[in-house]
Curated annotation (Swiss-Prot):
Keywords: Carbohydrate metabolism, Chitin degradation, Chitin-binding, Disulfide bond, Glycosidase, Hydrolase, Plant defense, Polysaccharide degradation, Signal, Vacuole. The keyword Ligase does not apply. The active site is at E137. Induction: In response to infection, elicitor, ethylene, wounding. Defense against chitin-containing fungal pathogens. This is Endochitinase 1. Belongs to the glycosyl hydrolase 19 family. Chitinase class I subfamily. One of its GO terms (molecular function) is chitin binding. SMART domains: ChtBD1.
Length: 321
C-alpha cells in the first residue's frame, strides 16, 4: 500500500473511531465546516491536505485558510464597493443602510475560498459575478428611468415584496409556527428547507428566526455566500463555475450547459429564465455583470447567457426555493 493510500485509509479509519468529529458536505445536507475549515471527501472538517485539496476529494471551503479573506478587502475596497452599489442607500430603497461593506467582509471570512482562488482576473470575476447576480435579485432599478442607469441600483431590497409563506412539509426542516420563509437577503433565499440547510451550515437557527436574513446584515450576506459556495447535485456551485473548476458532463453538454456566467444564472433561476430564448431578466443580470467587470478592470469571459441551456430539474434555486 502506498503512503498516499495509507494516509487516506488512516484518515477514514480515524473518522470511524472519532465519532465526535463534525460532519459536512453531501453527508450532512450540504453543511459547511465552521471557522472556514475544509470538508473532506468523507464529510469531516479539518485543515490538512487530506481535507483541503481538491484532488483529495475536498467538497467545500477547499482553500484551508481557516477564515482569512485572502485580501478580499484589497480586491474590493470600501470605496469600490460603494461605487459598484451606488444607490443601495438611496432614500427610495427599503433596505437603505442595511447592506454594509463591513458585513460583506465579515461574512466572507466564513467562506475563505470566495474570491481567493485563481489569478487576479479570476478573483475579480468572481466578485463581479456574485455582486451581479445578487444585485439583480435585490434591484431597485427596474421599470423606471433610474438615475445613473439601472445597473447602479443593486441591493435596494432585503425582503420579497408581497410574499407568501413558502412553507412545504419537510421532515428534516419543518416550518416553525407562524414563520414565513419568503425571499430575504442578497440571494433572496426562500422555502423552509433552504432556510434550514443554510442555518445548519452557518450555525444559526433560521427556521425559528428567518427574519435574521433581513435584520442582521452579516448573517444575510452569509446566506448568499452559502448558496454561492455550496454545490447541490446535479448543480455545481456558482463558485466552481466562475473559477473554472467545473467541467460539463455528457448530460450537461447535451443540455447546452457550458461554463460561464450564464450557467450561474441557470443554477440560480434556470427554471424561469433559461432555455427559452431571449429573456429580459437574463439581460439584466448580464448588464450588472458587465458593469462590475468594467469597474474591476476584468474581462467578461464566455457564455454570458443561458438562452440555449436546459434548466436543472432539482436542487435549491431562486425559482424552486
Amino acid at each position: 500500500m502506498s503512503f498516499r493510500a495509507l494516509s487516506v485509509f488512516s484518515l477514514f479509519l480515524s473518522y470511524l473511531i472519532l465519532g465526535s468529529a463534525e460532519q459536512c458536505g453531501r453527508q450532512a445536507g450540504g453543511a459547511l465546516c465552521p471557522g472556514g475549515l475544509c470538508c473532506s471527501q468523507f464529510g469531516w472538517c479539518g485543515n490538512t491536505d487530506d481535507y483541503c485539496k481538491k484532488e483529495n476529494g475536498c467538497q467545500s471551503q477547499c482553500s484551508g485558510s481557516g477564515g482569512d479573506t485572502g485580501g478580499l478587502d484589497s480586491l474590493i475596497t470600501r470605496e469600490r464597493f460603494d461605487q459598484m452599489l451606488l444607490h443601495r442607500n438611496d432614500g427610495g430603497c427599503p433596505a437603505r443602510g442595511f447592506y454594509t461593506y463591513d458585513a460583506f467582509i465579515a461574512a466572507a471570512k466564513s467562506f475563505p475560498a470566495f474570491a481567493t482562488t485563481g489569478d487576479d482576473a479570476t478573483r475579480k470575476r468572481e466578485v463581479a459575478a456574485f455582486l451581479a447576480q445578487t444585485s439583480h435579485e435585490t434591484t431597485g432599478g427596474a421599470g423606471w428611468a433610474a438615475p445613473d442607469g439601472p445597473y447602479t441600483w443593486g441591493y435596494c431590497y432585503n425582503r420579497e415584496l408581497n410574499p407568501a409563506d413558502y412553507c412545504q412539509w419537510d421532515p428534516n426542516y419543518p416550518c416553525a409556527p407562524g414563520k414565513q420563509y419568503f425571499g430575504r437577503g442578497p440571494m433572496q433565499l426562500t422555502w423552509n428547507y433552504n432556510y434550514g440547510q443554510c442555518g445548519r451550515a452557518i450555525g444559526v437557527d433560521l427556521l425559528n428566526n428567518p427574519d435574521l436574513l433581513a435584520t442582521d446584515p452579516t448573517i444575510s450576506f452569509k446566506s448568499a455566500f452559502w448558496f454561492w459556495m455550496t454545490p447541490q447535485s446535479p448543480k455545481p456551485s456558482c463558485h466552481d463555475v466562475i473559477i473554472g473548476a467545473w467541467s460539463p458532463s455528457g448530460s450537461d453538454q447535451a443540455a447546452g450547459r457550458v461554463p460561464g456566467f450564464g450557467l450561474i444564472t441557470n443554477i440560480i433561476n434556470g427554471g424561469l429564465e433559461c432555455g427559452q430564448g431571449w429573456n429580459a431578466k437574463v439581460e439584466d443580470r448580464i448588464g450588472f455583470y458587465k458593469r462590475y467587470c468594467d469597474t474591476l478592470g476584468v474581462g467578461y469571459g464566455n457564455n454570458l447567457d443561458c438562452y440555449n441551456q436546459r434548466s436543472y430539474n432539482n436542487g435549491p434555486s431562486v425559482d424552486s426555493m
